[in-house]
Amino acid sequence: MKKLEIGGLYKHYKGTKAKVLYEGFHSETREPLVIYMHLEDGVIWARPKEMFLGNVVVDGKEVERFQQIEQEILIKPSSN
């Protein structure tokens, strides 16, 4: 299984970006979970780790559900 980076940025196969906040466990099943935040709207989600790091089939091609991306430096241009 691929390694998960806490604090890492990931791009969902549909194009949204997310930041991994924590790794946790389901309280009843002890299934490993990934807690992450969508950068576009700030909503926090939990997904099974195996699913987060797994693949999906899109147009007959297998792709990563979340692909790790480089940190982006976002600088707001000055209004001078």
Specify the residue positions occupied by each region the protein language model found:
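Mixed-charge, low-complexity intrinsically disordered regions
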Residues: M1-N80
